Design a protein with these regions (language model features):
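Conserved PLP-binding catalytic core of the aspartate aminotransferase-like
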Residues: 165-194
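PLP-dependent enzyme catalytic core of the Aspartate aminotransferase-like
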Residues: 208-251
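Conserved active-site segment immediately N-terminal to the catalytic lysine
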Residues: 59-71
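A short linear hydrophobic-aromatic micro-motif
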Residues: 164-168, 200-205
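Active-site phosphate-binding strand-loop segment of PLP-dependent enzymes
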Residues: 1-50, 65
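Active-site C-terminal subdomain of aminotransferase-like
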Residues: 71-157
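Hydrophobic alpha/beta core scaffold segments
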Residues: 189-202, 208, 217-220
Length: 251
């Protein structure tokens, strides 16, 4: 609010769901601020790791441009983007200069109205996306939002019951990615390498934090992963890293 009140800015860019930290921005609060005080400001939202996993009412919120990618909550390989634009940003695009070609919304609008694309897209992604949309339709969109939140809560309970700490503050926890502070100083490299041999791929960004994805899985698959993780933990204990494993098992 302080920065926008200067009148120097005509665009606000927001990361809805920060993948690295598991922090989710409150879009409702931002929407209320913009609609009440700065309706002329263009609002851009990065929803790469939230779209299809967290409910985002684009029109109701007044988002002008929202962009996502398929490798997160959509459950598809990387290499394909999905976006939605408002009438306001289309009108703004028509009077802008030096837009280039590949990011010119007018070009996309022209082809969109003919049910075409400016260039050949990734056809396998389109077929895969159609299948995911069928899965979402079968599950029910509200059930999908509910499932992701339940998975988030399930992981948070596990974190708290095992003596670790969430990186994000209360009220800012993401529904699709949980970031955990390694307050007990577990040997992340050791855990990573052992889990990898058992078919689990774990984030190894640093020893300070590690992350658990809450999207495109359900309680059954997580229960199975936790059980197998305990089996791996037992094996690690036999191999000598007992301190790490006692902590993993909550001892």
């Amino acid at each position: 609010d302080k920065m926008l009140s200067t009148g120097k800015y005509d665009v606000l860019a927001v990361v809805h769901n920060e993948t690295s930290t598991g922090v989710m921005s409150n879009l409702d609060e931002i929407s209320d601020l913009l609609s009440s005080k700065y309706p002329e400001v263009i609002w851009l939202v990065d929803a790469v790791s939230s779209m299809a996993g967290i409910k985002i009412e684009v029109d109701k919120l007044g988002i002008d441009f929202i962009l996502s990618s398929t490798q997160k909550a959509w459950g598809l390989p990387a290499g394909f983007s999905i976006c939605a634009v408002s009438d306001k940003i289309i009108k703004r695009s028509k009077v802008m200069k030096n837009k280039g070609y590949f990011f010119d919304i007018e070009v996309y609008e022209k082809y969109f109205n003919k049910f075409q694309t400016p260039s050949t897209p990734s056809i396998p992604h389109l077929f895969a996306l159609r299948e995911v949309l069928n899965i979402i339709k079968k599950e029910g969109i509200n059930n999908r939002w509910k499932r992701h939140k339940e998975m988030r809560d399930y992981v948070i309970d596990w974190v708290q019951n095992n003596g670790q700490k969430l990186f994000s503050e209360n009220g800012c926890h993401s529904n699709t990615i949980t970031c955990i502070e390694n307050t007990q100083e577990w040997n992340i490299d050791n855990i990573y390498n052992t889990l990898l041999l058992k078919g689990f791929r774990m984030d190894r960004a640093s020893d300070a934090i590690f992350r658990v994805p809450d999207f495109f899985i359900n309680r059954t698959t997580l229960d199975d992963a936790v059980f197998k993780g305990r089996v791996v933990a037992t094996q690690l204990a036999r191999e000598g890293d007992k301190k790490v494993i006692d902590e993993l098992l909550g001892k």
